[in-house]
Swiss-Prot record:
GO terms for cellular component: cytoplasm. It comes from Thermobifida fusca (strain YX). Pfam families: Cpn60_TCP1 (PF00118). The keyword Chaperone applies. ATP binds at residues 30-33, 87-91, 414, 478-480, 494. It is an enzyme of class 5 (isomerase). The lineage of its organism: Bacteria, Bacillati, Actinomycetota, Actinomycetes, Streptosporangiales. Keywords: ATP-binding, Chaperone, Cytoplasm, Isomerase, Nucleotide-binding. It is found in: Cytoplasm. Its EC number is 5.6.1.7. This is Chaperonin GroEL 1.
Length: 541
């Protein structure tokens, strides 16, 4: 086992703080509408230029073992805030830095870290309540567009996201893909999309786009492999007599069954497409059942006594259109009963509430989105690959940001909500001793995001903070224009969830810093001595 380094008390905490400061100082220059960019060197390929806090944080690796741990703890704040809300990473980092700086100063002066932590937690809880009181529900498409525009730093992206959410609903899927042209495109699929394409390219009906488009098809949904023609032909004959195309979604289609479909497609006698079922094991069963409910069909499986050769037309699903590419399938306007779909949606929601696994929750949410909403695809194009990656990442963040706004409402942006919520919160907060000192640490820390936004925009941070304290709630500095205005009217807004998550996650990590009494780190290994002699005595190799 490798040797360890151990540091105690002040030495331990200061080591962590140095690491945190290096990371936070690199990240906080990006805050606000006038935030600067940071260039990230890559081992391979061109460097990346970004102003996304979490991307910058991920790149920072420090040499000193204690500093490295400090930086990693703050990375966790940024990552957690990004995962939950899609934005607010830089705000969370700035808050964490301010809380730790003020907290460690008080610990060094003799304050009890546990008392400080209790005070910090009490103040954060009160401010979170005040944020909820200040919050307004998202009522218009324009508000969604404003929120997403601020996150992405581009009004056009905001408009496209608002349009997409308007079409697919708050639980609908909005995906971001790389487009083939400059600018943005929005495609809508009012149905279900999953990541499995046709088994054979011979099924393509549009050879230019290499996709299969079938209008008003029957859909055979089978939780089994289909390889034997004897059991499969009765189904094909019934569909052929009905004069409709056939979509087969099964564990696999192979052998003579696949040959029959391909040969008839090439001859033009019968349009069809075979698709492998999405997922594995129990998840595949559940997804096939989702497809069956959406299309009004049944899952053909011997587990429930349904055999392929006995399948009738009324057991097959229906849809207005099915589009299949080599990678994905989109079912548009399934013929399923609305009440059955609603029942299935409620069932999945209940499962989401019950599960403890993050992975299961994510997969259940994907299933919920496929059933409850449609699918919107935003295609982004750019001049260079570096620009394209950065733009795609910004759009993905902005989508999560817009969904957070719909979920919990919106607040005045620009760091103003935290400051104004804290003024109201501290009027009602009665603490004593070290707890009161802990609360005062939070009071000073919540000024930092506004201060940093002002500094990045070229203003004097302290002056701006004092000015905003004297203004009515909702009035603050619009750093893009340099004017003090009604931020809701100007569209300078942040999702409540983003601001709340940033504060709570920052306070959580600050508490860990303050109550740390020892740090145990890996001892850096010395580089191995070079055994080869400097002079090889004229030897040839």
């Amino acid at each position: 086992m490798a040797a360890k380094l151990i540091a105690f008390d002040e030495e331990a905490r200061r080591g962590l703080e140095r690491g945190m400061n290096q990371l936070a100082d690199a990240v906080k220059v990006t805050l606000g509408p006038k935030g600067r960019n940071v260039v990230l060197e890559k081992k391979w390929g061109a460097p990346t230029i970004t102003n996304d806090g979490v991307s910058i944080a991920k790149e920072i690796e420090l040499e000193d073992p204690y500093e490295k741990i400090g930086a990693e703890l703050v990375k966790e704040v940024a990552k957690k805030t990004d995962d939950v809300a899609g934005d607010g990473t830089t705000t969370a980092t700035v808050l964490a830095q301010a809380l730790v700086r003020e907290g460690l100063r008080n610990v060094a002066a003799g304050a009890n870290p546990i008392g400080l932590k209790r005070g910090i937690d009490a103040a954060v809880a009160r401010i979170s309540e005040e944020l909820a009181n200040l919050s307004k529900e998202v009522e218009t498409k324009e508000q969604i567009a404003s929120t997403a525009s601020i996150s992405a730093g581009d009004p056009q992206i905001g408009e496209y996201i608002a349009e997409a959410m308007d079409k697919v609903g708050k639980e609908g899927v909005i995906t971001v893909e790389e487009g083939q042209t400059f600018g943005l495109e929005l495609e809508l699929a009012e149905g279900m999309r999953f990541d499995k394409g046709y088994i054979s390219p011979y099924f393509a009906t549009d050879l230019e786009r290499m996709e299969t488009v079938l209008e008003d098809p029957y859909i055979l949904i089978a939780n089994q492999k289909i390889s034997n023609n004897n059991e499969f032909l009765p189904v094909i004959e019934k569909v052929l007599q009905a004069g409709r195309p056939l979509v087969v979604i099964a564990e696999d289609v192979e052998g003579t069954a696949l040959q029959t479909l391909v040969v008839n497609k090439i001859r033009g006698t019968f349009k069809s497409v075979a698709i492998k079922a999405p997922g594995f094991g129990d998840r595949r069963k559940a997804m096939l059942q989702d497809i069956a409910i959406l299309t009004g069909g049944q899952v053909i499986t011997e587990e429930v006594g349904l055999k392929l050769e006995n399948t009738e037309l009324d057991m097959l699903g229906r849809a207005r259109k099915v589009v299949v590419t080599k990678d994905e399938t989109t079912i548009v306007d399934g013929a399923g009963d609305a009440s059955a779909i609603a029942g299935r949606v409620n069932e999945i929601r209940a499962e989401i509430e019950r599960t403890d696994s993050d992975y299961d929750r994510e997969k259940l949410q994907e299933r919920l989105a496929r059933l409850a909403g449609g699918v919107a695809v935003i295609k982004a194009g750019a001049a260079t690959e570096v620009e394209l990656k950065e733009r795609k990442h910004r759009i993905e963040d902005a989508v999560r940001n817009a969904k957070a706004a719909v979920e919990e409402g919106i607040l005045p942006g620009g760091g103003v909500a935290l400051l104004q919520a804290s003024i109201a919160a501290f009027e009602k907060l009665e603490l004593e001793g070290d707890e009161a000192i802990g609360a005062s640490i939070v009071r000073r820390a919540v000024e930092e995001p506004l201060k940093q936004i002002a500094i990045n925009a070229g203003y004097e941070g302290g002056v701006v903070v004092e000015k905003v304290k004297s203004l009515e709630p909702g009035i603050g500095l619009n750093a893009a224009t340099g004017e003090y205005t009604d931020l809701f009217k100007d569209g300078v807004i942040d999702p409540t969830k983003v601001t709340r998550s940033a504060l709570q996650n920052a306070a959580s990590i600050a508490g860990l810093f303050l109550t740390t009494e020892a740090v145990i780190a890996e001892k850096p290994e010395k580089p191995a001595a070079n055994n080869a002699g400097g002079d090889m005595g004229g030897m040839d190799f």
